[in-house]
Every structure is written in C-alpha cells, then in structure tokens.
Design a protein with these regions (language model features):
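Active-site-proximal beta-alpha core segment in soluble small-molecule metabolic enzymes
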Residues: 96-243, 248
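Conserved, mostly hydrophobic/aromatic
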Residues: 77, 98, 129, 193, ...
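Active-site loop ensemble at the mouth of alpha/beta enzyme cores that anchors a bound cofactor
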Residues: 255-270, 279, 301-378
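Flexible loop/turn segments at secondary-structure boundaries
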Residues: 102-104, 129, 245-249, 302-305, ...
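C-terminal accessory subdomain/extension
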Residues: 5, 348-450
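Active-site loop/helix belt of alpha/beta enzymes
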Residues: 184, 197-323
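A charged N-terminal "starter" segment
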Residues: 1-30, 39-154, 445-450
C-alpha cells in the first residue's frame, strides 16, 4: 500500500492511516452512522468509514497502556529506511541522530545495509554516543563546549570516533585552548569543513536557504583547508554541504499550487547552482587534502538529487525514518508515518468536541501552523482556531469527536522528527497490533542535549 495517494490531477494527499483509512483531518461521510449517530462504542468499523477509537492497530497494541505515550511503527520505520537506501543510489547514508534521538533505533537502522555512520548535533551527544560504542560520528555543527573538547582531545579513542565541524580558524584556536596541556599535541582532532549552500539572487540581495557556514566560495574553503592541514594536532577528513532549502522544503503543498510551482522552479535553479559550486569546492579542498575521506550532502527531501552528484560520496538523512508531517509535501518521494504520539480524551464539552490532555508540542523553526502537531487518528479532528494545541489541554473539533469516549486515545503526528522524543521518556515499538519492545529516548536516558 502506498502511504500517500494522488488524485486524477496528481495532487498528493496526506498519508492515510493504517489499513487504508482516509486522510487524517477529513470528516466522515455525511449521513453515515458515524457522522451523526451515537458513539460506536468500540464496535466494528462502518463500511467505508475511517476507524474510530480502539479500531487502529495502534489502539489495539497499546490498549494496556495509558496515554500520553509515543510509539514507532517498526514496519513503517523499516520501509522508510529501505526507501532512503533506494533513493541514495548506492551511496551510504549517514543517519542524522537529532531526527531519531533513540539509541535503540539508531542501532537498528545502522544494522541495515546502506547506512553508515552518524551525524550528531552536539559534542556532548557525540561523546556519549562514542562511549556507547558508536563509531564514525560527524558532529554537524561547530562547538564551543570547552569541557567536551578537553575530553575529546585527551582520549585518542574518542578523537578517532568523532569528527568536529569547522568553518572559522577561531574554532581551531578554541580546540587548541581546550587541550589538557593548553598547547597543540595529544590526540589528533578530525576536522570537517562546511560549505554554505544557500541560493543567492540579485547579487546576493536575496538569499534562499539557511544561514550556516561563512565559507561560500571554493577559494575560502581551500584557505581554511590549508590552515587545518598546516596546524599540528588536526587532520582534515571531510567536507559537508547541507542544502536545507532543497532537503527540507516541500514542493507540493496541498492547497497551494502557485507556491508549490514557485518552490519547484527555485529548487531546480538552486540544485544546478549548488552542484557546480560543490564540485568546484571539493576539487579545491582535495587539492590541499587529497586523502579527504568523505563529502557529505543531502537531507531526506533531496536524497536522490544529491546522490546523483559525482562530487558527493555520502548522503545525510534522518527525518525520513519517522516521516513527520513536514515531509508530506514532496513530489519526489512518499513516506509512511512511523512515529506517533497519543493523548487521552479527558473531557467531552459538547457535541462535536472532545478535550485531550496536553498536546501543545510545537516544532522549532519560524512560527506557523505548519509547526504544530496534526491530529491523525481517528480521522476528522481539527484544532479549535481560538485555542490551538494547549500546554495542558487541547480541544478538538469535528464529527469524529462524537465517537470518542473518556479515556480513548487520539493519535498525533509531530511536525518534525526527533523533537517528539524530547516530550517522552520511552518509545513503544509496534509490529502489527503488538508492542514488541519499549526503549528509552535520549530524554529517558537522562540526556537532553538541547
């Protein structure tokens, strides 16, 4: 079953619920028993209707558990992993740990063919993962963690497992100052340089993409590469170029055809410009460091495009394993929602309304409706526009509310991937309609790095 469907005009819908349920957020068929009749009280689904409380595999699997809780559908997770490998066209995928935030699931995906190495988000996380047995960890962001740098440079095994990100000579100075003896020497630090990938128009007056590295031109990268190579205690091993405006911006947003076409035009031009500049940057850096080990690029939304570039040796991806709601809007791939959270119904204020506990878990980024979790199951629920998702309680409107009882679960999808794990101590791993394991998140292990 394809997790996303297209109508006759090619417009993509949201991923349907398990067992081919209609799109989340849609209302039941007018006039049906569930649209206007009494609550279904856990009876069999009405023909052609979305499942109500207790009817989904997630409800059956967690019937013995109280919400709030979070689950990962392992069949969906594994299918998403296989799709990432298919799209990477033989190039290894480095897993973005921030998009998973669960050691057990990092181990699971790294055991699969086609995945190699981690991309971490803080030095403290990197050191913890290295001490836990993970190897080949690329820290994707520069660090100012002096205590962590002191630890890294004092232990050759840690230094061999972790590669730090550098885009400024001052970061090299900070690393040297953090060495236990305060001077160069000791463990050799592995270094990766980052290329800015943003798309510039009108002589730089218009920028599309994240503000990341100050290193934009090949000559700038070559100059810093020479500084690294010529400095004792450092070894230049990699180059990274993360194209967030290509990998994380959907190009087929439901109900926004003009915006979607504009995004596609922008992304086509940006991909062409970046491919040329990345090739030149890699050539410039390899002239200084011929034994460069890797060139990393990509992101879930651009895996197949980045993999087609000869200059790139590996692809970064992570969100594509959980497939949060922000990744519903891509023409080039379809994913299966794998990570969900459930909130319990605690009130029934009136017809067509239920209230669940909590639920106000917005994602990072520019504030907007797309950063909110979306009610997923049962289908046909929406937020009250005057309240939205709340800190302690969330009212939900729609005909599906009348089929819910006190204590029933409402399932949500987070807007982003790993940020869900900052709200829950554990993930219940589901296969079919069974919980087969319960594993701690980073938070559940007492590790809240950001």
């Amino acid at each position: 079953m394809s997790p996303q469907t297209a109508d006759a005009h090619g417009d993509r819908a949201r991923p349907p619920a398990p067992d081919s349920s209609p799109t989340p957020g849609s209302s039941p068929t007018p006039g049906s028993a569930r649209a206007g009749g009494p609550p279904c009280a856990g009876g069999p689904p009405c023909a052609g209707e979305p499942p109500c409380a207790g009817e989904t595999p997630y409800d059956r699997a967690t019937a013995h558990l109280d919400a709030p809780l979070a689950v990962v559908d392992l069949q969906a997770f594994d299918a998403n992993a296989a799709d990432l490998v298919r799209r990477s066209k033989g190039k290894p995928i480095r897993v973005a740990s921030k998009s998973v935030r669960c050691r057990a699931l990092l181990e699971r995906v790294l055991a699969r063919e086609g995945f190699a190495g981690l991309m971490s988000f803080t030095l403290a996380e990197s050191l913890w993962l290295a001490r836990s047995g993970f190897r080949d960890i690329l820290l994707a962001y520069p660090t100012a963690d002096r205590a962590g740098l002191s630890e890294l440079t004092a232990e050759p095994q840690l230094a061999a497992a972790v590669t730090v990100m550098v885009d400024d000579p001052a970061q090299l100075d900070l690393i040297d100052a953090a060495r236990p003896d305060g001077a160069p020497g000791g463990a050799e630090v592995r270094v990766c340089l980052e290329l800015d990938t943003s798309f510039r128009l009108l002589g730089g007056k218009v920028r599309v993409g994240a503000r990341r590295s100050p290193l934009r031109e090949p000559a700038q990268l070559a100059a810093l590469a020479r500084a690294v190579v010529g400095r004792p205690g450092f070894r230049l091993v990699g180059l990274m170029a993360y194209e967030g405006h290509l990998a994380g911006v959907g190009d087929e947003v439901a109900g926004k055809p003009v915006f979607s076409r504009t995004v596609r035009v922008m992304q086509a031009a940006a991909r062409k410009e970046l491919a040329r500049r990345r090739w030149e940057a890699v050539r410039a850096v390899r002239a200084v460091a011929p034994r460069l080990e890797f060139v990393n690029g990509g992101g879930t939304g651009s895996v197949q495009h980045t993999a087609a570039e000869a200059a790139v040796t590996e692809i970064a991806a992570g969100s594509g394993l959980y497939v949060p709601r922000l990744f519903d809007n891509f023409r080039s791939f379809s994913g299966r929602p794998a990570a969900l959270f459930a909130q319990p119904v605690v009130r029934r204020p009136g017809p067509g309304v239920v209230t669940v506990l909590g639920g106000g878990y917005p994602a990072s980024g520019a504030a907007g409706a797309d950063r909110l979790p979306v009610p997923y199951l049962p289908a046909g629920l929406r937020y009250d526009p005057q309240e939205g998702p709340g800190e302690v309680q969330t009212p939900l409107l729609g005909p599906a509310a009348d089929g819910l009882r006190i204590g029933d679960k409402v399932w949500f999808r987070h807007a982003k991937a790993g940020e869900l794990c900052e709200r829950f101590d554990a993930l219940h791993l589901i296969e079919g309609d069974r919980v087969v394991d319960t594993v701690p998140t980073y938070r559940g292990e007492g590790r809240t790095f950001l």
